[in-house]
């Protein structure tokens, strides 16, 4: 089963993902935890370019193709092999991030981005996408505090430096995209405590795994 986590900056994706991974492992599931950008060796180099606060001059089109390169490598080297081994794959961001950030955020055509991503991932879309939702201002405050605390503001602060208007477009884009793909999307209130968010996520995934065991879902969808 392939599960992705999406949301604006500071929505708590990494915390929720780690909580779910621990629960899955406790219940006997093999788990592969990964992220975008940076899930492969090549991806780590691309991540350093894409998130560096000094690279504010990257054009939307250049940004798009850097993300697509990261994703194509990630799917080929990490995601597909883990799925082939029967593992539950958890990814902190995936193709929907590009559709939303570069589409709704930057103004590129979301449907064109959907097609480009389909090529990059070879038709592999998640079985389940968990969208952690909160107001952009609250998320940015969390993300900025985290980056400063971890000494990563310069190395990974490029998106946090975007305007509140940009992050508002991204948040609205996520909700629009989730509504268009409701079959695989579940929206979780990210203003809750981390423990409550993990509880909600575990409940969603436990139900989805029940569908898998009954043959109603597969490991990786063809089409979004």
Swiss-Prot record:
EC number: 2.7.4.9
Protein name, as recorded: Thymidylate kinase
PANTHER family, per the entry: THYMIDYLATE KINASE, UMP-CMP KINASE 2, MITOCHONDRIAL
Residues that, per the record, bind ATP: 7-14
GO MF assignments: ATP binding; dTMP kinase activity
Function field: Phosphorylation of dTMP to form dTDP in both de novo and salvage pathways of dTTP synthesis.
Family: Belongs to the thymidylate kinase family.
GO cellular component: cytosol
Catalytic activity: dTMP + ATP = dTDP + ADP
InterPro entries registered for this protein in UniProt: P-loop_NTPase, Thymidylate_kin-like_dom, Thymidylate_kin_CS, Thymidylate_kinase
Assigned keywords, A-Z: ATP-binding, Kinase, Nucleotide biosynthesis, Nucleotide-binding, Transferase
GO BP annotations, alphabetical order: dTDP biosynthetic process; dTTP biosynthetic process; dUDP biosynthetic process
Enzyme kind, highest EC tier: transferase
Top-level taxon: Bacteria
Protein species of origin: Nitratidesulfovibrio vulgaris (strain DP4) (Desulfovibrio vulgaris)
């Amino acid at each position: 089963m392939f599960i992705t986590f999406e949301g604006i900056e500071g929505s708590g994706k990494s915390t929720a993902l780690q909580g779910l991974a621990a629960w899955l492992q406790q219940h006997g599931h093999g788990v592969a935890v990964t992220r975008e950008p940076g899930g492969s060796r090549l991806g780590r180099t691309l991540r350093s370019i894409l998130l560096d606060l000094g690279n504010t001059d990257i054009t939307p089109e250049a940004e798009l193709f850097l993300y697509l390169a990261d994703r194509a490598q990630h799917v080929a080297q990490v995601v597909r092999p883990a799925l082939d081994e029967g593992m539950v794959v958890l990814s902190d961001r995936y193709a929907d991030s590009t559709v939303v950030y570069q589409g709704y955020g930057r103004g590129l055509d979301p449907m064109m981005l959907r097609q480009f991503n389909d090529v990059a991932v070879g038709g592999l879309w998640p079985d389940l996408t968990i969208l952690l939702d909160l107001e952009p201002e609250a998320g940015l405050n969390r993300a900025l505090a985290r980056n400063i605390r971890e000494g990563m503001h310069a190395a990974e602060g490029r998106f946090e430096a975007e305007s509140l208007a940009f992050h508002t477009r991204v948040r609205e884009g996520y909700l629009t995209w989730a509504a268009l793909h409701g079959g695989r999307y579940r929206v979780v209130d990210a203003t809750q405590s981390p423990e409550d968010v993990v509880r909600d996520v575990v409940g969603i995934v436990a139900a989805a795994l029940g569908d898998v065991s009954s043959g109603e879902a597969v490991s990786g969808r063809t089409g979004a």
